[in-house]
Amino acid sequence: MTGRVCVLVMDSFGIGASLDAARYGDVGANTLVHIYEACKRGECDIDGVRKGSLMLPNLASKGLYHAAMASSGLPFIDLSALAIPSGYYGYAVEQSLGKDTPSGHWEMAGVPVTFEWGYFPDKPYCFPEELISEFIKQCNLPGVLGEKHASGTIIIDELGEEHIRTGKPIVYTSADSVFQIAAHEEAFGLQRLYDICKIARNLVDKYQIGRVIARPFAGKPGSFKRTGNRKDYATPPPEKTLLDFLKEDGREVIAIGKIADIYAHQGVTQEIKADGNMALFDATLSAMKTAPQGSLVFTNFVDFDSSYGHRRDVAGYAHALEQFDARLPELEVLLQPNDMVFIAADHGCDPTFPGSDHTREHIPVLMFGPQVNSKFIGRRDCFADIGQSIAEHLQLSSPLAHGVSFL
């Protein structure tokens, strides 16, 4: 076996609108560049936290800005002032039809999503009457609240008090293929929320819905806060992913954060939960200290998307990027001679863009390790090139069905 692989997914960190962005209403989106420019204009200053230009020295040294320039062609930074990147760098184009978390992650692991997800229309009472009535019946509920497209933080402020008073869970959706259920951890019960999400998962299968998401919250009216006990109930990938093949080959597949949920807990040998980007980084470091040869450590950093991208918090996103960047040296010192680290994203979520939804963008593809030289890998025509490269490095007995290795 040849070394280990660590994959860090910066959830929603796009680096330029894709050629098909018009189909999604995302022409001009660019998560990285727009954050960079907002910082440069002084619009992302946070008293006592951050100020001025976006500072990502470690990601820059791995080729992030070179990849972003190649992706969009926008001359947002003087590349001649930067050192030659110390690893492989480029960008990837999504082949999956969606711009969502499962599509991006599954494609990255060798399974592009070539079918259309089901979506709920953006109108009041957006869910089919049959679905809601059966959900209420099977869960023994007095009813439901919401039934619309909404921001998760706004809808709990709007309906949280009524939810506590009536015992009716809040159901809502977004532009993604999701059925989301919010409930108060104490008043409704966390386990009860999980139980009704499992029922909902079975009910929405016929509608081709990608995920049912438990959105627990706590606190009192006027100060409700979502907790870290979110759970995603995903439909399983339609084919075996890289994770399945590694597990079948006797490898350790260590899923950190919501990775196990995204892959419907398939192909995973160990699940580690953590809340918040810094706790997720801590968990990644701990896993890398003990992960055996031939293993995969796979982490999703969800805060970029859920806390800053969807909420269109440009300054918060900038600060989160700088926090993430500052910790990369801690990971590098743990790498063994043949280890490789891959940094990528699953889609975009430009915090400067209208609305609150994901944006159809290219993703960065950065790869480094003790024995990795500098190489521009250019445009990758499928996220699955990442999975194929991992499969080659970990010496799987046969290649994945999709993707071209860039090793």
UniProtKB/Swiss-Prot annotation:
GO terms for molecular function: magnesium ion binding; manganese ion binding; phosphopentomutase activity. Its cofactor is Mn(2+). It catalyses: 2-deoxy-alpha-D-ribose 1-phosphate = 2-deoxy-D-ribose 5-phosphate; alpha-D-ribose 1-phosphate = D-ribose 5-phosphate. Binds 2 manganese ions. Keywords: Cytoplasm, Isomerase, Manganese, Metal-binding. Pathway: Carbohydrate degradation; 2-deoxy-D-ribose 1-phosphate degradation; D-glyceraldehyde 3-phosphate and acetaldehyde from 2-deoxy-alpha-D-ribose 1-phosphate: step 1/2. GO terms for biological process: 2-deoxyribose 1-phosphate catabolic process; 5-phosphoribose 1-diphosphate biosynthetic process; metabolic compound salvage; nucleotide metabolic process. SUPFAM superfamilies: Alkaline phosphatase-like, DeoB insert domain-like. NCBIfam families: deoB (TIGR01696), PRK05362.1 (NF003766). This is Phosphopentomutase. It comes from Legionella pneumophila (strain Corby).
